[in-house]
Structures are given as C-alpha cells and as structure tokens.
Amino acid sequence: MNREIKKLFKSSIITFVLFDMDRTLVDTHTYFQEEMTNSILHTVSKIFPAKPLKKQLKITKEIVDIANKIYEQQRYPILVDTLSELALSQYIKEKKVKINKKKVYKELKSSYKDFYLTSPQPFPYTIEAIHKIKSFNIPIGVYSHAQNEWTRIKVDRIRNEYLKRYGEGIKIPFFTTDITDLKDKEGWIKAGKYHKINPKRTLVVGDSLTADIYAAIDAGYKYAVYLTHTNKYVEVEQRAHAKIFVTKNLSTVFNQHSFL
C-alpha cells in the first residue's frame, strides 16, 4: 500500500473512501468496446452482406473509432446505442451509403437490449482492494455518472464476489447523478451530502482526471487517487489544499505486500 495513504488510514485522518465506478472498480471500457464492436459488426453485415468478413471487420473498426472520438468529446454521459447510431450515421454520410435508416437503427438499438442488464467484470484486484480498506474499518461508497439501475447491478456483482471470496458481506452504498448532468463538481458535492461524509477526510478514487479528480477537488475533497491505467509516467498538476496520488490501478495502491 502507498505508505502515505496507509498512514492517513491508520491515523484516522481519512474516514471514508469514495469510489468512481466505471474503469475504477469494473472494467467498463473492455465491456463497452467488445459489445459495441459486436453490435456494429452485426449491423455492418446487414448493410454490406456481399462484402467478405475481412472488409466488414475493417468497416466496423472505422465506425467504432468514430464512436470513440465522439465519446471523448462528450461533456455528458451518452448511451451506447445512441453513440453507435451517431457513429454509424457519420460513417454512411461520409461514404454516401444508402440504407433504410429506420430499419437499421431499430435493429442496432435492439442489439443492445441486454447491455445495461449486465455488469462489466470487476478488475482482478477490485475485491482484494476493498477488503484491504475494510481491514482498517473504513467504510466505502460509490459515486457514478451512469444510470442508477445499472450502477446497482455493478454494485451487486461486486458485493456477491466479495461474499464469495471472504465469506462475509460488505456494505457499498452508491449515489448516481442523472445522465443529462454535467460531469463536474456539483455531482461530487451531491454525492458527499448523500453519503453524509466530510470531504476533507474522504479519499476519492477515480480514473478521470477531469470528471473525477479535479471535479472532486473543486467540490472540496482533499485527498484523491488518480488511476492512469498505464505504465507510462503521467504528469498531474497538483492543486492547492489537496493531495493527488497518481498510480496505475487499485492494485498498486492497495496491494497485499503492504500488510506483510
């Protein structure tokens, strides 16, 4: 465990850990990319049935790349079926492809009917990290920008896997903001009020420097862990009156060696 964080835990300076959910506790990125690729490939095969699979895969990749660019530019969360439709629409417009839009988009949307009924896989180190925090008797909670019911499904999966591994339950209260809300400090302020926590004594953990870390600090939180998901050095601008810990993932913060 990071020595400074361990010291903050042991001295009870930090009394709550508030997690972001997606790409922090569960691997939403992989789930998102795999499901979107499969759905778009299915749609592409209907639009271009005569083209060989290799060409269909190439077209699919181009559309997925467009979708990823659109996603990166969004200030608001966006549903996967809406994102896929926007990307496909841009592709067929650029390539001047004629399709029955109503039929194609309806079929594309239908392919995602179970998307928000399934939880992405928790990262391999998620359950252990939560257990390490619990060993300090520090409660945890979640704040997510995703829909309430989908967040509940993710939380339930984490709780079930925790119970299966350690033979005991764990409380994971969660708070969500509406999908139309901006990813800014207001959400973190609301999350703090919901969880009834002191932002100055809370450790925020998230994977987005802007939507999680800086937004939380702007909301008054003092401690944050930024998960980069890369082995490369990432330079982060520290903020006054706050401390940002930069690390690859939860495993490099709450690892087993810290308790040997």
What are these regions (language model features)?
Residues Q33-S45, V80-S89, Y105, N148, ...:
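An amphipathic alpha-helix signature
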Residues M1-V17, I127-K134, I138-L260:
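Asp-based, Mg2+/Mn2+-dependent phosphohydrolase catalytic module
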Residues F48-Q56, K93-I99, E161-E168:
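Short helix-coil transition/hinge motifs at the ends and kinks of transmembrane helices
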Residues E35, S39, Y125, G187:
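Charged catalytic carboxylate motif
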Residues E62-S111, K132:
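A metal-dependent, Asp-based hydrolase signature
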Residues Q121-P122, H145:
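Catalytic beta/alpha-barrel core
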Residues S110-P120:
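Surface-exposed cleft-lining segments at the edges of enzyme active sites
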Residues N2-I63:
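Active-site neighborhood of HAD-like aspartate-dependent phosphohydrolases
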